[in-house]
């Protein structure tokens, strides 16, 4: 006989550098509890295979980068207007390479499932034509999944563009949400991005299942609405919360970061941490407002202020700000180890862009939040954080701009007020639930077992 097939070989296909880390966390979560399963991550991310392999550092997980493809001129000219279109189009242009990769893998392994990020919706056509069971990976929460699955209903019932609706939207398992808080990609029905999301939502219903980065206790109402068919027929759901199951990074690197040494000198729960993701850059005017608000709040702070490499941070901030706040503040424009910062005893609050991974990390370490959404699905995440689970305070902003007075007010409210204490109490409760979900007998591990059974039966 020829070379024996491995018992199970799961393929994870992801699109962008931003979502690659979530795919790696999912792969590690699966192999940690099912070491006999081999996983290959196929990605269009612009990363060297050797570098990604170092990050993965797991013999059961193989990384395979697809060869870059030339982008059509009409797409490259549109990148700055709507970068999300690129997230969908690159995987679509890679379909031929994906098919080749799957055929190559199938010669040595028994492919049991293909897990695709929603940006890789175009891969659904390839996998179904090859009779490979296909699962969608939603790196956001169940709230976001509800929004996707409700998109066809909005498409049929809303006349014109959602951008012009200016009204409340009712969705099962949701608090009442304003149309302006829906993801901007759903705003204009004639755009390619709108059509991509609509097609993705329809394919999700036809898939073998949907993996969601959340846990039952966190999004019980949304989970019940989905399970009870309030969003129409859906495939099996697997709520895994795999990113919170991922352990801290190795201490070799992070111990060298000076912000952690600075935190060691601060009182317990006294520091407000401001971090807005890899794309969270602000205008010079907004940076000054943040600085003024922090200084007037009187609170200790650790602030990651992202700027272009050629810019001088000191010149962008109010004159004398860094020297006046030297004893109570730490400002940097380079990478900081977010998990290690959030887990530090000195950190008592987190001003966040409401990216889902950041929200889960904050909850897992019991850190209350102030929500400042910037892009993608972050506005709907803020509604969930503030209205549904009550673990954050909102920042009032107009067209994304936050005044110094508003920031000062919310920081004081979180760190000093009775309302802030209530948010902290709720976060402390969910910290326990977060840990329980990924512990023995927890809901996420139970969901993982159901998923493994579905692909190995």
UniProtKB/Swiss-Prot annotation:
A GO molecular-function descriptor: UDP-glucosyltransferase activity
Binding residues for UDP-alpha-D-glucose: 139, 336, 338, 353, 356, 358, 361, 377-378
Class of enzymatic activity (EC top level): transferase
Keyword annotations from UniProtKB, A to Z: Cytoplasm, Glycosyltransferase, Transferase
SUPFAM superfamilies according to UniProt: UDP-Glycosyltransferase/glycogen phosphorylase
Subcellular location per the Swiss-Prot or TrEMBL entry: Cytoplasm
Predominant location: cytoplasm
Binding site for an anthocyanidin: 19, 376
Documented EC number(s): 2.4.1.286
Listed GO CC annotations: cytoplasm
InterPro entries: UDP-glycosyltransf_plant (IPR050481), UDP_glucos_trans (IPR002213), UDP_glycos_trans_CS (IPR035595)
Record flagged with keyword Protein biosynthesis: no
Active site: residue positions: 19, 117
GO biological process, alphabetically ordered: pigment biosynthetic process
Reaction(s) the record says it catalyses: 2',4,4',6'-tetrahydroxychalcone + UDP-alpha-D-glucose = 2',4,4',6'-tetrahydroxychalcone 4'-O-beta-D-glucoside + UDP + H(+); 2',3,4,4',6'-pentahydroxychalcone + UDP-alpha-D-glucose = 2',3,4,4',6'-pentahydroxychalcone 4'-O-beta-D-glucoside + UDP + H(+)
Pfam families cross-referenced by the UniProt entry: UDPGT
Annotated tissue distribution: Expressed in petals. Not detected in stems and leaves.
Key word Transferase present: yes
Function per UniProt: Glycosyltransferase involved in the biosynthesis of aurones, plant flavonoids that provide yellow coloration to flowers.
Family: Belongs to the UDP-glycosyltransferase family.
Protein name: Chalcone 4'-O-glucosyltransferase
Organism name: Antirrhinum majus (Garden snapdragon)
Lineage: Eukaryota, Viridiplantae, Streptophyta, Embryophyta, Tracheophyta
